[in-house]
UniProtKB/Swiss-Prot annotation:
EC number: 1.14.14.14
Major place of residence: membrane
Designated name of the protein: Aromatase
Function statement: Catalyzes the formation of aromatic C18 estrogens from C19 androgens.
GO cellular component: endoplasmic reticulum; membrane
GO BP annotations listed: female gonad development; lipid metabolic process; response to estradiol
Amino acid sequence: MIPETLNPLNYYTSLVPDLIPAATVPIIILICVLFLIWNHEGTSSIPGPGYCMGIGPLISHGRFLWMGVGNACNYYNKTYGEFVRVWFSGEETFIISYFDAWQALLLKPDIFFKISWLCKKYEEAAKDLKGAMEILIEQKRQKLSTVEKLDEHMDFASQLIFAQNRGDLTAENVNQCVLEMMIAAPDTLSVTLFIMLILIAEHPTVEEKMMREIETVMGDRDVQSDDMPNLKIVENFIYESMRYQPVVDLIMRKALQDDVIDGYPVKKGTNIILNIGRMHKLEFFPKPNEFSLENFEKNVPSRYFQPFGFGPRGCVGKFIAMVMMKA
């Protein structure tokens, strides 16, 4: 009685189990064809790994997490050429390894920072750091208001405080600038100096040249600011160290509008990675794959050598870093 109620028209339901496999296969094939057509219409003319129904972006992102940004960029440049299209966190990204064209890949996606209980300890740590920095700046401000000779107490923080007093900066600007110098400078500068010490140990003739120059320029006295322009060999050694073994070998930008780079269309919002580490190994340098001061015996155009980045988003502490490394 129940089967007759459910099937009042007496359809041949016994055939359904036999027909389902036969009908499923064409449907799956049709879906795959539709996916291929959809992917084909959106395929980019720029060389790079295929989209392949969303599998390509997952593999691309996984490679960056597994190999690291620098090694992954070098892999894609060697595999596909100087201009490559890949994906970061689902976003289309271009890697450009030549001179015409830096936290680059965050291991945590944006959604991580939108879930309060996941990033609570990071927010608290940031507040503690900011609070400690504000206390130090206020102590510096109080000290400047009581000293008799300002010349003896002028430094980076003092200049920022005076700029605030003139109305050029806000208190938040001063706090942020000092905080960035404290966070960004120690890591990159210390690693750069570490690499320089290794290169000095490996190249004793370069060490001898620098020592002779230092003795000629300064003698037995301490280094002064006027000595910096005269330390040419030391400067070339610093440049060559940053070229041969860069601490930061990538620069990342986001296209603010549709553009064309070297004939390739770039859509607004696309991430663009400039592979500086590879750019510094071009044939422009006499010995691009060797550590040699000959690479900087002649003036190097800025488009071939960008250790601190470029433009308004370049490293704000590059001049301070050069003085500190020379000293």
